[in-house]
Each structure stands twice: as structure tokens, then as C-alpha cells.
Amino acid sequence: MELLHSINDFNEAKQVIAGGVNSPVRAFKSVKGTPPFILKGKGAYLYDVDNNHYIDFVQSWGPLIFGHADEEIEENIINVLKKGTSFGTPTELETTLAKEIISCYEGLDKVRLVSSGTEATMSAIRLARAYSQKDDLIKFEGCYHGHSDSLLVKAGSGCATFGSPSSLGVPNDFSKHTLVARYNDLNSTEECFKKGDVGCVIIEPIAGNMGLVPAQKEFLLGLKALCEKYQAVLILDEVMSGFRASLSGSQEFYGVVPDLVTFGKVIGAGLPLACFGGRAEIMDLLSPIGGVYQAGTLSGNPLAVCAGLSALYKIKRDKTLYTRLNALAVRLAQGLKKSAQSYNIALETLNRGSMFGFFFNENAVRDFDDALKSDTEMFAKFHQKMLFKGVYLACSSFETGFICEPMTEEMIDLAVAKADESFDEIIKGV
């Protein structure tokens, strides 16, 4: 496999785009490689400008639960496109999508559509602070909630990949109200409550940006109890896990009803769309009813709303979708672990629904510190081997992988076979 055209494209991109990419992880810096420049996607596959194709376990970082270029979703988008791209006015589609989202999640009375996960979490926190009338926020090490200033404190994903606990350019005053607790640790969390005047807590119930690290059930239930004890608003960030782990996101696994929740990725089916929502008494503080301002020129634009609505309709029609996707994710996780064990390579694997993760680590990973103990050099070698064998994995050991509906057992078994070849070559130093 060659990437000559991609190498040239990347060099050209770096002349006019900062870093050559529009999101840092895409640069392949942590795996010491060159990103393939993608020409098209179809189903479970990506096709690059060098005529290579890959089984895609990234799926645009999660949104494409039905894979690339799904015909039904595409057709619906095209029909809406013919009527216009954006109006800046209310549309019936927005109301329909809101109803569909609300019907899937307990405790959700109203939502507000936005264009990105960052907007959703930023707006939810502003709203929670207004409702609680308290400024301090608790987040958790390794959880990523977008790139708004107050949340870039010990975030996962890119910050972990590049060895930075936060970001330059964020004034101390922006983060002084952000308290950071250890994931899956109630004692650490209550210490944060005692330190400040905490108005809200935000957490990924199924963390996907320090690798895949699900919350322990007793921890999440305990966190809900702490929020009630200290009268703080609980925000579940389900931008990644919502409609991915299950139809009801994390609620199927934990049964926790938050005060506010954020969704993204799947609800836009690959177009820019996210939302936040919760109890009516909180949501009604938003302008134009209340005094909490939030707005967006393209919020609820018809193309993204149509894409998301089409995806949700398909999900609800397919009663065995999540069962099948989970089975494939389990097959992949178990296959990778068995292959690694045969070469005496330490590898921890797990999945939640169609989300999967793996760590080159001797022990199970339950928090950010555990994740940071993983062998990132081994991951980089493995990633490069798999890429050149036609398997496209997330280009950071602190990211999550995804299964899509067009994938088959044969594709999973092929990926495991390529992993076996890769481990063999790594051990032999080839």
C-alpha cells in the first residue's frame, strides 16, 4: 500500500490550513504517520486518493451508525436540499426531530438544537449555572466535553494525545470555577463538592475520549445522589454514547435520569447537529422565555435535521439493530484480545453497544490515570500496521472505535486476522 498522493495532499494542506487539518487528531501525530486523504466512503469502507480502501472503524468519529453514504438518508437529504439549505426560521422538521429524541430518553421534556457538541455542553453548563445560581463546575479527568475554555482542564482525547493537561490561551480566570475529580471515584468527587460552591456536574457516562472507559454503575448512581445532596445540576454528556450505545444511550446500562443531557453525532448522521435538553423548569430559562441567552445562525438547519431524523427513523424501525451491532463489537473485542494473548501482548478490550475500545495495558482501565499507563508506542506500531493492511482505526489510543450497520462477521474476522498478522510482525520486528 502506498500513500504518495496523500503525502502530497498533506504537504499542500499544511501550507494553507493550520497544521494541515481542521481537527488536531486527524494529523496522525500520535501514531507518527501521514493521514490518508479520503475520496469517498460507502457502507463500512473508506476509499482514499491513492486507490486504497479500508474497513472503517472510525465512522467519522461516531455519527455514521448506518455507515457511509446510506441510500435512504442520502435520498432524504437531497429532497430537502432541493427546497433550500437554510432559512433561519422555524421548520416543522425541527419539531419532529425534537419529539423523536425526547421519546427515547427518560426525564427529557424539551430540547434545543445546536450545531456541535461543544455548543451543546457549553450551553447546558450556562443553563445549569443559571438554574442553580452557583458558579462552580465539577468535571472528570479524561472526559472531553468540547473545546470551550472552561472545559479544557485535564480533558481527554487530544489533550491526552499531545501530553498537555489543558490548552494555551485559556486565562486562569476561565478555569478557576472548574473543579476536576477522578472518574469512577466518589470520594474524589465529594471532596470537590466540599471545596466549592458547585452548581453543576458534567460527565460522560460512557467516556470515549480517554479510550472507552464506562462509568461503574454504583459510581454513577452515587454521583446522582451527591448532586441531589448538594443541590447541583447533573449533566450527562451523551454526545458520543447517545443513540450509539443503545437507543436510550447510557440509560439502558445505568438507569440514571439526569437534569440535563447533551446529544450529538448520531442525531446528525454525519451533518453538523447536536442538542441539549432536560426538565422543562430548567429549559424554560432559555431565551426567549427566560434570561439565559443561546443562539445559532445554522441551529436546526433543515439538511442536518433531515439527516438526523432519517437516521432515527431507521434506528427505530430496526428492532434488532443494537443487538447485532453489540454482537459484532464483542466479536471484534474478543478477537483482538485473543490474538494479542497468543503473542504475550498485554491488551485490554471492551465495548458498550456499538462502541469499542482497547488499551495496550496489563490491567483493566477504570480512570484517566489507568489510561495514561497504556503503551502508546505499541499502539502507534499497531495502528500503522493495520492501516497498511486496510483496517482504519482511530489514530489515537485515547479514542473510541465504532461498529456500523453494514459491517459483517466476515469483515470483523478479517480485521482480527489482520491484527494477528500485525502482532506477528511487531514481535518479529518486521
Curated annotation (Swiss-Prot):
* Gene Ontology cellular component annotations, sorted alphabetically: cytoplasm
Question: Per the record, what are the reactions this protein catalyses?
Answer: (S)-4-amino-5-oxopentanoate = 5-aminolevulinate
Coiled-coil portions: none
Q: Localized where?
A: Cytoplasm
Primary location? cytoplasm
PANTHER family xref list: GLUTAMATE-1-SEMIALDEHYDE 2,1-AMINOMUTASE (PTHR43713), GLUTAMATE-1-SEMIALDEHYDE 2,1-AMINOMUTASE 1, CHLOROPLASTIC-RELATED (PTHR43713:SF3)
What protein name applies here? Glutamate-1-semialdehyde 2,1-aminomutase
Q: Which source organism?
A: Helicobacter pylori (strain Shi470)
- Lineage of the source organism? Bacteria, Pseudomonadati, Campylobacterota, Epsilonproteobacteria, Campylobacterales
- The record's gene field reads hemL
